[in-house]
């Protein structure tokens, strides 16, 4: 389980902390949702958990032990809201192999099938993919690292309804074997699909009373 205790973050240019006294638990197998308006600190929370930034206060723990930023970078896989801005490979194949000295073709094919991209042309440019395909490709890149925690920034934003349902089901399947946190401004899409649902407001987490806990069968 990934856990925060009294987590705080105060940007130097902000009049007040963006996150303050934040306690959050991400158990394996129980997807968690954090909703909030733009600028509420959702993405900052993901960056702290992923080891891309350091909190000003509090602790981040994995299985009860303090977890450094470097450890969190190995532990967590972060998929950004706009993955196309973070693609570095000129082709799908290059993007998938970045950072891997050795990666068997069978492993790549298995992950692409897992995210619904079986048969995707390896020489296709990532920026030529549809929005839904780009999200899936970014997810495949992270899954190849075999992270213990998946952190997803607005995974359904801008997708049509049919693709949204497919992505939602994929996320639930992935959450069975790892900790998973989704941040979104569309919490209603996850109704009945998550174990915990929170709203980030004023730097703190509040329960979302309209969200029913528990996964869909």
Segments predicted by a language model, with ranges:
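Conserved ABC transporter NBD signature motif
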Residues: 58-74
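Helix-to-loop junction immediately C-terminal to a conserved catalytic motif
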Residues: 50
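ABC ATPase C-loop
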Residues: 142-143, 174
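Conserved H-loop
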Residues: 178-184
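ABC-family nucleotide-binding domains
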Residues: 160
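Conserved ABC ATPase signature
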Residues: 125-129, 133
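Catalytic Walker B motif of ABC-type/P-loop ATPase nucleotide-binding domains
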Residues: 150-154
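Conserved ABC ATPase "signature" region
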Residues: 105-121
């Amino acid at each position: 389980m990934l856990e925060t205790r009294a987590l705080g973050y105060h940007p130097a240019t902000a009049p007040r902390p963006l996150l303050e006294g934040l306690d959050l638990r991400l158990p394996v197998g129980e997807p968690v949702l954090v909703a909030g308006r733009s600028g509420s600190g959702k993405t900052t929370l993901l960056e702290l958990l992923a080891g891309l930034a350091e909190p000003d206060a509090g602790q981040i723990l994995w299985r009860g032990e303090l977890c450094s930023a470097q450890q969190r970078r190995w532990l967590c896989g972060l998929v950004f809201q706009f993955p196309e801005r973070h693609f570095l490979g000129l082709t799908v194949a290059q993007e998938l192999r970045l950072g891997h000295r050795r990666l068997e073709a069978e492993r790549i094919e298995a992950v692409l099938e897992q995210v619904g991209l079986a048969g995707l042309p390896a020489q296709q440019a990532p920026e030529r993919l549809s929005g839904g395909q780009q999200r899936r490709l970014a997810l495949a890149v992270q899954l190849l690292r075999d992270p213990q925690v998946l952190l997803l920034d607005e995974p359904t934003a801008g997708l049509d309804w049919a693709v949204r349902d497919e992505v939602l089901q994929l996320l639930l399947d992935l959450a069975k074997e790892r900790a998973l946190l989704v941040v979104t401004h569309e919490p209603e899409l996850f109704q009945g699909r998550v174990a915990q649902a929170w709203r980030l407001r004023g730097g703190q987490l509040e329960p979302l009373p309209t969200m029913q806990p528990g996964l869909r069968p």
